[in-house]
Amino acid sequence: MSVTITPLKPTRSELLRYVKFGIDLYKDNDCYVPPLVLDEIDTLSPKKNPAFDVCRAKSFMAYKDGRPAGRITAIINNVVNSRNKVKELRFGFVDFIDDDEVVDALFKTVEDWGRTQGMETIIGPLGFSDMDHEGMLIDGFDQIGTIATIYNYPYYAGHMERMGYTKDIDWVEYRIKIPESIPDKYARIAQIVKTKYNLRSVPLKSRKIVKERYGQALFKLINEAYSDLYGFSPLTDRQIDHYVDQYLGLIRLDCVSMIVDSNDDIVAVGISMPSLSKGLIKSRGKLFPTGWIHLLKALKGKSEVVDLLLVAVKPEYQNKGVNALIFN
């Protein structure tokens, strides 16, 4: 039985095959939440993703006996490497069958490509930026995933350890039960912080206003707030424009909490949305012909679960209780 590794050409058809493999691998798994196929294709396309302005990347597919058996993308983020003074290769968008030969061939190919590009270390799974799926699940395989998080089979970590990879950091996902009413202590803290720093919550009535008035500032706040986080890749102006157009038109205004100062400048934001997990599972990540109906129902209807996508607080306001205002 032979394994072959094929470099991916960034054409629509080959990218679709690449994305589809990652979804088909989990077709019998009830906890896996597929990405939106079109978004994933655009993320991997140099013509669509402005991250390629600052990144080099090469994607590969593994085939065993002529059948798709694995996929992986090698990424060099020049901004991160320059900022951290490292020669680091990232790997991401990785999936594979439970087969030593396939996994070894995939990672050897990526490592060899990295060496030809002058890289000295390898780390992952990471994306082009922190807007991409990152990390590898090592616990909680019986929990349904979210649109923003990674899900993978338990055997993944075993293969990584077998090849000599070691865990660098833990990312933890929490499930929080929302109380029926805000605790008095929490409400008092929010009021104290609001008065002390002259802050206020912005009533959001129009997605258009959010995009035009706050869109750029929101992602620049994320750049500031996340600058010291593990593996963070600051977004360029073109990336910010891209994400403003891609995401802010889809938000539910009642799921966004935005805090501004006396100059109407954003100092903190929290963005959540009704869980799209079940809608994505039903649609298998496809909008057409009927997938959009499942997603629209999930987005517009009542949901027992809300996914908290991000919270960002301006550095000078961190550790000062501003989170109480966001969640109040």
Task: Name each model feature, range by range.
Residues 3, 150-230:
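Acyltransferase donor/substrate-recognition loop-hinge adjacent to the catalytic core
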Residues 17, 102-105, 151, 155, ...:
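Generic recognition of stable, solvent-exposed alpha-helical segments in well-folded globular domains
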Residues 83-164, 286-328:
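Acyl-donor binding region in acyl/amide transferases
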Residues 22-64, 72-82, 209-313:
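A conserved beta-strand-loop-helix scaffold within acyl/acetyltransferase catalytic domains
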Residues 120-127, 168-175, 258:
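A structural signal for short, well-ordered beta-strand segments and their strand-loop junctions
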Residues 1-31:
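Generic start-of-chain signal for non-secretory N-termini
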Residues 14, 35-46, 53-62, 67-71, ...:
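Catalytic cores of nucleotide-enabled group-transfer and carboxylate-activating enzymes in metabolic
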